[in-house]
């Protein structure tokens, strides 16, 4: 289940609670892209998506020193399993309740735009869940999906496809092999 709150009133307290409880009772993983003012609606969600600015804002609100401290405090407070932070040029970081922090750096030199970044990451995470991928591989897949968006020329006509993702992963793999030489 993917819950994405655009602040239009569709994801309200009662509805979110019902969806989350039903999904959890059937062991269906939940991915959420919450409004920072609606974090209370995400208690018990498996995967939460933030952009780096959101984590920085929460760090200040919580009065902690680092983004990592803020992430772990949010995970504990809201009973999340994972907090995925999308940082554009800095890549993707996944903070987890029971695992080490994983970071996948962005490999692009030319970032063109960020519209659709969270949606692309949510889809990548859903695919990773369906394939039982590790948190590390989930970070790599989410980062590849984000790089497809970050490198796209035109967002209004760009649709993230399986082929785009395969091509991006191939490029990332090639770059990694070349850098190890």
Predicted regions and their residues:
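Short, ordered loop/turn segments at secondary-structure junctions
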Residues: 6, 35-37, 53
């Amino acid at each position: 289940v993917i819950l994405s709150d655009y602040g239009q009133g569709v994801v309200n307290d009662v509805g979110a609670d019902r969806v989350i409880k039903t999904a959890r009772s059937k062991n269906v993983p939940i991915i959420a892209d919450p409004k920072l003012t609606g974090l209370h609606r995400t208690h018990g969600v498996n995967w939460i998506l933030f952009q780096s600015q959101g984590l920085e804002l929460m760090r200040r609100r919580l009065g902690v020193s680092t983004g990592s401290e803020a992430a772990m405090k949010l995970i504990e407070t809201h009973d999340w399993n994972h907090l995925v932070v999308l940082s554009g040029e800095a890549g993707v970081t996944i903070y987890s309740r029971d695992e080490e922090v994983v970071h996948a750096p962005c490999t692009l030199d030319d970032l063109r735009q960020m519209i659709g970044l969270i949606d692309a990451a949510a889809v990548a995470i859903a695919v990773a869940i369906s394939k039982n991928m590790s948190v590390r591989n989930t970070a790599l897949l989410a980062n590849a999906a984000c790089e497809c968006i970050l490198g796209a020329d035109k967002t209004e006509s760009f649709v993230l496809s399986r082929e785009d993702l395969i091509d991006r992963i191939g490029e990332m793999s090639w770059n990694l092999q070349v850098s190890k030489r």
